[in-house]
C-alpha cells in the first residue's frame, strides 16, 4: 500500500516542491496557497487512515496483486469449462475417426479373431474412459461439514475460518476446503479430493492405455497415410506446373478423391494426437502412481519434503503417518477389500465409495506398534 501511494502521489509532490523552490511561497496567489494547504491536509488524513507500521513491502505487493489474483481465480473457472469441452471434442473426434476411417480399412485386412479382440478391447477401454471422466467431473471431492464440534481437527483454515481435518486443504479456485485434496484439475473443472481421486487416476490410466492402443495399432495406417499425403503434395505441385505451361486453361482431374484426402489427414491427426497425449498423460499417470504408492497426495509431497529436511537437520527420520505400505496403499486408494474386487471395482466400472470419511484416518501398523511399545514401557 505504501508503494502504491508513493507511486500516485509522487508526481504531485514533485510539482509542489518545484513551485516552492522557484520562489512562489510568498508571491503565489491565494488560490495556489489554498491548494498547497489542502494537499498537506489531505496527505495527513491519508496517512492517519492508511498508515500501518507493521506493513512492509510484502503487504504492499500482496495488496497490489490482489486484483490479479481475483482475475486469475475467476478466469480459471471459465477455463475449466473450456478444457472439459476440449477433452470431449478431442475424444469424440478420435472415436469418430476410428469408426469412419479405421474400421472400414481393417475390415478388409484383419481376420475375424483379430477383429473380435480389437472390438471388445477398444469398447471396454472407451467405456472405462467415459465412465471415469464423467464421475471425476460430477462427483464432489468432499468437503468438511460446517457447524460440527465432534470432528477431529488439526488446524483452522485461514480462509474459511473453520476447523480443518487432517489432510484437508483450501482450494483458492473453488473457495472451499477439500478433504484429502490433491490438486485442482482444470481438465475436470473440479478439485481432486477424497471422493473422486480414484476416478481421476483411473481416467488418466485408461486414457493413457487408449492412446497407446490407438497410436500403436494405427502405426501402419499412419505410415501409409503420411506417404500418401507427401505424394499428394508432390502431385499438386506438378499439376500446377503443368497447368502453367499449357496454353489452354483446363485443370486435370484430381488423382485422390476428397474422401481419400480426408481419410489420410484424419489418420495422421489421430496418430499425432494419441501419441502426444500418451506421452504427456502417461508421465502424469506414472507420477501419481508413485505418489499413491507412497501414501501421499501432490500437496502432501511438498509438505513431507519440507518436514523431512527439517527433521534431517535435527538428526531424526521422517515417516509418513499415512503410508500403509505399497500394496495396502493401493488397496485403500482403489477400495479393494477382496480379490474379486480387482475385477469388479478396478477393471469394470464401479461407483463404490472410498474407504473412510476423509476426516479421520486409521494409523498404519508401524504407528500402532510404536504406540503399543510405548504403552508397555
From Swiss-Prot:
Molecular function GO terms recorded: palmitoyltransferase activity; protein-cysteine S-palmitoyltransferase activity
TM region(s), chain numbering:
78-98, 117-137, 199-219, 267-287
EC number of the protein:
2.3.1.225
| Any GO CC annotation of this UniProt entry | endoplasmic reticulum membrane
Topological domain ranges for the Cytoplasmic compartment: 1-77, 138-198, 288-377
Active site feature: 185
* Annotated membrane topology: Multi-pass membrane protein
Sorted keywords for this record are: Acyltransferase, Apoptosis, DNA damage, Endoplasmic reticulum, Membrane, Transferase, Transmembrane, Transmembrane helix
In terms of superkingdom, the source organism counts as Eukaryota
The record's subcellular locations are: Endoplasmic reticulum membrane
Instruction: Tell me which parts of the chain lie in the Lumenal compartment.
Output: 99-116, 220-266
Q: Name one Pfam family in it.
A: DHHC
Instruction: State any GO BP term from the record.
Output: eye development
Q: Outline the subunit composition.
A: Interacts with ABL1. Interacts with COPS5/JAB1.
- Record function comment: Palmitoyl acyltransferase that mediates palmitoylation of proteins such as PLN and ZDHHC6. Required during embryonic heart development and cardiac function, possibly by mediating palmitoylation of PLN, thereby affecting PLN phosphorylation and homooligomerization. Also required for eye development. Palmitoylates ZDHHC6, affecting the quaternary assembly of ZDHHC6, its localization, stability and function. May play a role in DNA damage response. May be involved in apoptosis regulation. Involved in the proliferation of neural stem cells by regulating the FGF/ERK pathway.
Entry protein name: Palmitoyltransferase ZDHHC16
Q: Which organism is it from?
A: Macaca fascicularis
Q: Please name the taxonomic classification of the source.
A: Eukaryota, Metazoa, Chordata, Craniata, Vertebrata
